[in-house]
Amino acid sequence: LLNLWHYLVHTPLQAPEPLVKKYEAKAKRMKLDAIDPVVPGEPFPSRHEADQRIQRRVVQSHPTYAAMVELMDHCIGRVLRALDDAGVADETLVVFTSDNGGLSTAEGSPTCNHPLSEGKGWMYDGGTREPYLVRLPGVTEPGTTCRTPITSPDLYPTLLEAAGLDARPEQHTDGVSFLPALKGDAGFDRGGVFWHYPHYGNQ
């Protein structure tokens, strides 16, 4: 089992200068550099910041952020190539996901989540819908999708079931295995998803 946490893409934004210049040039070609990407929104709902307004990014045009995405893609490619080189790719379950939506309304608002609403720290789709890509050779069909909500706690019971293992007798798992969805079960339904997030107003 390998758990690889990339710091990309996260603040502070920083990337190799050649990559940043590549996306600065792309933004200029697309005339995105002529658009003010961040607009002032409503006042912060939290009392201690009531004198400030949310700064919301409405255009995806941050060259350093884009450079970080490309760099992360390159690094993940190295991992996948290593699996191929080791001859274990066909027997390895690979999961790529994130812990939250893009940071679109705070800390410099480096990214835009359109057409989804809001971003990290919000209960709307921009904050709760993240990439969740799974490759399980012989089980998953490339290009298929699942519309049933999946959450982070679901990963552990899914890994157990995929490996043919049971949870320890004393172990409680909050999540639900989504292996049936990976096998193409269109009727997979995990029921409602509820959680409490005491981080009011994104601050």
Regions found by a protein language model. Give the residues of each.
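Conserved small-domain helix->loop->beta segment predominantly found in fold-type I
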Residues: 170-173, 181, 185
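Glycine-rich, aromatic-lined ligand/substrate-binding cores of catalytic
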Residues: 152, 157-158, 175, 179, ...
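Short, intrinsically disordered, charge-balanced linker/junction segments flanking boundaries
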Residues: 82, 183-203
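Active-site-proximal cap/lid insertion segments
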Residues: 1-153, 161-172
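A residue-level signal for beta-strand positions that form part of recognition/binding surfaces
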Residues: 113, 175, 191-192
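Generic alpha-helical structural context detector
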Residues: 134, 157-161, 179-183
